[in-house]
Amino acid sequence: TGGASRVLAIMEDYIQTEWPDLDVWLTSTTEEWAVIAVQGPLSREVLGPLVEGIDLSREAMPHMSAREGKICGVPTRLFRVSFTGELGFEVNVPAGYGRAVWEAIYTAGQAHGITPYGTETMHVLRAEKGFIIVGQETDGTVTPDDCGLGWAIGEAKKDFVGKRSLARPAMMASDRKQLVGLLTVDPKTVLEEG
C-alpha cells in the first residue's frame, strides 16, 4: 500500500528500541509486486476464467480474505478487498508479470464492459461510498463516532490507544464542530471540493 514505507520505518524503530535483542532483518518487497485492482459488480465474472486454484465465490472468499493460486498461469496472491465500496479484488503478481496479467484481465473484461481507472477515480468512488481516509477527511477533532466507526472502539477493554483523547472535555462538548455529508437536490450537480 501507499503506507508500506511508514510501516517499515515503524517496525525498524521498534526493533531498535523495543526488541534490540531480536536477531531480525526487515526487507521491503513492495517493488517486487505488481498490484491490479479489479472492482465492480462483475469482477468475479472477469477474473473467474483466468484464476486457477481459487474459489472466488462469496462463501469461499469473503470480504477481507486472501488466497494464493494462479492467474493466467502466474503465481498470485489474491485479496478480496475493495477501496471503492464495490465488490472487488486485488491481484498481486510478481512485478515482471504485471503488464501481461493486466492486459489479460483487460481483454477478459471487454465482454463485461471493463474500464481502466486511476487513483483519482478510485478516491472519488471511495468517498462516494463513505470510505474515509483517517488524516485526509479527518483530523484530531473527529471521533470514531463522528464518522460511523464507533463500533471499532474497544469499550469492553480497560484501556486502548486513543482512550484519553476521546475523554477530553473538548471532544465531548455538544457545540463542537461536526463532520457531515452533503447531498445536492439535483444528483447530477457535483459539489466542488473544499
Task: Label each residue range with its predicted role.
Residues 1-194:
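Conserved, structured C-terminal
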